């Protein structure tokens, strides 16, 4: 679409905002169109993920709900992005690679569980970790060696870099990618619970990317200046559109789950956006719901191993609230509210520095 701008009547395609808008609506329409067809096919093939044996009783009714919906909304976002981005932009190409590779890891994991009807038949934790490290390196190393990406570490509400991580930045970035990917995966346990916070996080990071990629805005707001980041905003918009199409079928009561093919890809992509926009630390606030879910699991496992006692009735923490009697819809909406507030606070850091 960008290359149509060479024609005199299509010069407006040079604008990132225009191409982002097109990408959003293309992905939204693709997702809305393809998802019901996928649901019908998945039901016919009995492509549903087994329910965890210790899950709350209310989850037993979800045993026939199709999974792997992430494959559809990620594909929709990628197709829409390919129509709208510039192909000579290393940030955009690396971002698409991140989406595709982490989606493939999740898809392999999903297929193992679906085909054998066993939650433990997907990728082993060790194999999944290794695959995530390799995928992360494929996405990050080209940026590192091209010198397009700063290795300086920035913290929220402070305009200067804290220090230069140099070669250790690679290790730190891989840690961010893997942590973010798995955090969203842990959150995806209730209908729409991971979807809406992901939309909020993508929107916030998209704003940071747009501002940092614009030399005038970045200079005025004292943000890191990184030329070329604006193209990734188009992919953000496409993924938000695809997620909104998915949410139409994923909201309570869900007709389809995203599966690991969706959650691992979303988390990995959100982590990647935080890295290239220099918001690795602020990601703790941008993805606060994901952090909350992850910390609850760490506390639960750590407490049980050390003290032989559980902190929560069940982890991740959304299951704890189910166990104490909260209805699923109430948990979902309250977590959405927390995600919205945390992202508004993160956006406040743009001016407060």
Swiss-Prot record:
Its main location: membrane. Keywords: Cell cycle, Cell division, Cell inner membrane, Cell membrane, Cell shape, Cell wall biogenesis/degradation, Magnesium, Membrane, Metal-binding, Peptidoglycan synthesis, Transferase, Transmembrane, Transmembrane helix. Its EC number is 2.7.8.13. GO terms for molecular function: metal ion binding; phospho-N-acetylmuramoyl-pentapeptide-transferase activity; UDP-N-acetylmuramoyl-L-alanyl-D-glutamyl-meso-2,6-diaminopimelyl-D-alanyl-D-alanine:undecaprenyl-phosphate transferase activity. GO terms for cellular component: plasma membrane. It catalyses: UDP-N-acetyl-alpha-D-muramoyl-L-alanyl-gamma-D-glutamyl-meso-2,6-diaminopimeloyl-D-alanyl-D-alanine + di-trans,octa-cis-undecaprenyl phosphate = di-trans,octa-cis-undecaprenyl diphospho-N-acetyl-alpha-D-muramoyl-L-alanyl-D-glutamyl-meso-2,6-diaminopimeloyl-D-alanyl-D-alanine + UMP. CDD domains: GT_MraY. Pathway: Cell wall biogenesis; peptidoglycan biosynthesis. Coiled coil: none annotated. The chain crosses the membrane at residues 22-42, 65-85, 88-108, 129-149, 161-181, 192-212, 228-248, 256-276, 281-301, 330-350. Its cofactor is Mg(2+). The keyword Isomerase does not apply. One of its GO terms (biological process) is cell division. It is a multi-pass membrane protein. The keyword Cell wall biogenesis/degradation applies. It is found in: Cell inner membrane. Belongs to the glycosyltransferase 4 family. MraY subfamily. Catalyzes the initial step of the lipid cycle reactions in the biosynthesis of the cell wall peptidoglycan: transfers peptidoglycan precursor phospho-MurNAc-pentapeptide from UDP-MurNAc-pentapeptide onto the lipid carrier undecaprenyl phosphate, yielding undecaprenyl-pyrophosphoryl-MurNAc-pentapeptide, known as lipid I. This is Phospho-N-acetylmuramoyl-pentapeptide-transferase. It comes from Campylobacter jejuni subsp. jejuni serotype O:6 (strain 81116 / NCTC 11828). The gene is mraY.
